[in-house]
Amino acid sequence: MRSNSIIMSNINDERKINERYKMMTEQPVRRLILKMAVPTIISMLVTTIYNMVDSFYVGHLSTEAVAGVGVSFAYMAFINACGFFFGHGSGNYISRALGAKQGQNAGRMAATGFFSPLILGAIAGLICMIFISPLSRAMGATDSILPYANDYLRFILIATPFMMSSLTLNNQLRLQGNARFGMIGIASGAILNIILDPIFIFGLDMGVSGASLATAVSQCFGWSVLLWGTSRPGNVHIKFKNFTPSLYYYKEITRGGLPSLARQALSVVATISLNRMAVHYALPGNEASTVAAFTIVSRITMFCFAIVIGFGQGFQPVCGYNYGAKLYARVKESYMFCITITTAFLIVLGTVVYIFAPDMISWFRGEDPELIRVGSQALRWQCVAFPLMGMCTATNMLFQNIGYTWQATLLSMCRQGLYFLPAVFIMSWLWGITGLEAAQAVADICTFLTSLPFAIWIYRLLTAKSQHNV
């Protein structure tokens, strides 16, 4: 009986995988992307909303508390770097393998991509717990900010393996074309976090530690939901026996995940550099206010880009499946559709945020005028370059998804690294805090100018391939 049920389960899985293949390669591209994008947009929005609510509650404690959480962003960016590296690296391979109908390879990659960050996260969390105070200072904590940074980091360090592998699971599910389970996992954790935040922070009087514990518990819960999602029919199941830590699979993970690793690793350096320069160029006595201002701006811009990233993530599985199936005309059509929609959205959003920037900043910490002043100016500078990011995001995702590693890595390094880091140091040296406020906008403009020739080149290449394939 058991063998019969296993056979029936395998037949059901194969049928669902074949149905998804047909949907991904035959359904009209625009409708398909919208269908794929809705759950990823929802999960991105819910995640960024809980991040904003987290900062809102912490903002009711003190400016130093907000700054302490902001300093901890560098470690969170490290978790993201590793999670997205394994998630995008394994997920991109899985989508191409499914497009080429190589199910066994997809299963091995899924297991390897999941267990690797779980192990790495446990090691990283343990080492960082031992050196927690030096870590906080290295990330930019001053004497007044240090206690809050340490309090926030402790529970995050414990949850590191689950947070890291959770990102991997979400991206694997999404790139298989089943973002719904990813959305359920991410959204359930985020909603739980929103509920637990006020209970732990104020009800149990845990302060910043309460915000950290709420995040850790919620992330672990979301992880368990995502892991359950991989066992559902039609998804590539994760089995320890398929864990294959071989050079081939890690090479493929690196091929697909290096752009994400480069982008997120530079985000760590960028966050630390921004915190340090904010402390250095802040008005005397306003160091915590200045760091907190940039922390809040980061939360708001994350929310603004959530829909763009979510829409792009809906584009990625469509791109991966059809590129694997050699349907290049569909890849090109989906790419141009993604650019058009995201650019139009960012024009409207940038205008609205520019107008209401002071109100948005004061919502987090309305009783700190210096925080509102610095935050409003920095946010308005970023709005100027918002419309340029649609093309940059879509182009980077396309290169990463189809395995053009060095192009994707170069483009992913531009915004937070190649241009932002020099802008932070040079512009703050020339114009102080005003230069620091404008640094991200300048980096975004330079990133657009760099991405444009790559976008033209890949468009022409896809056109040639589609004509050759006819």
What spans do the regions from the language model cover?
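Residue-level signal for short hydrophobic patches within transmembrane helices
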Residues: 26, 30-49, 53, 75-82, ...
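Transmembrane helical elements of multi-pass membrane transporters/channels
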Residues: 35-54, 155, 166, 189, ...
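Helix-terminus/linker motif at the lipid-water interface of multi-pass membrane proteins
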Residues: 45, 49-67, 136-143, 199-206, ...
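Small-residue hotspots at the loop-to-helix junctions and early N-terminal turns
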Residues: 63-74, 149, 153, 212, ...
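Small-residue-rich hydrophobic transmembrane alpha-helices
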Residues: 66-126, 163-182, 291-357, 389-411
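Hydrophobic transmembrane alpha-helices of multi-pass small-molecule transporters
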Residues: 78-81, 193-197, 223-227, 303, ...
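Short runs within selected transmembrane alpha-helices of multi-pass transporters and secretion channels
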Residues: 87, 156-174, 182-190, 211-224, ...
